[in-house]
């Protein structure tokens, strides 16, 4: 089936995917985490198509379907190597959009970034 959504990505072993996917029984909203410890579906629920949003606040990631919080990852350390000793090549994560499959339309619209000053810089 089809899939479309948002991903927080560090590498092929460290990412989260929040999206909608078509199944034989309808549409599901789903948050999946892949970390060095393995792959986990954090939450999966029937949903109508809607607007997806991911907010990042330090290590916390919040995921919204329309204006309702779908799930929260309070400590998403798997998206960075700081303090983990993972021997990765750089520190930093990316955010991306994905759409795969047929017979659907994915519209990617707004990216909003606000000024952020980490606590250590104050």
Listing of model-derived features with the role each one plays in the protein:
Residues 1-122:
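Extracellular glycan-recognition regions
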């Amino acid at each position: 089936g089809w899939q479309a959504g948002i991903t927080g990505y560090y590498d092929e072993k460290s990412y989260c995917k929040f999206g909608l996917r078509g199944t034989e029984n309808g549409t599901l909203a789903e948050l999946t985490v892949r970390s060095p410890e393995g792959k986990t579906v954090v939450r999966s629920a029937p949903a109508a198509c809607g607007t997806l949003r991911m907010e990042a606040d330090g290590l916390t990631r919040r995921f919204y379907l329309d204006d309702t919080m779908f799930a929260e990852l309070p400590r998403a350390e798997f998206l960075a190597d700081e303090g983990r000793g993972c021997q990765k090549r750089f520190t930093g994560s990316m955010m991306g959009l994905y759409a795969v499959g047929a017979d659907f339309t994915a519209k990617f619209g707004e990216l909003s970034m606000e000024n952020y000053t980490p606590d250590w810089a104050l």
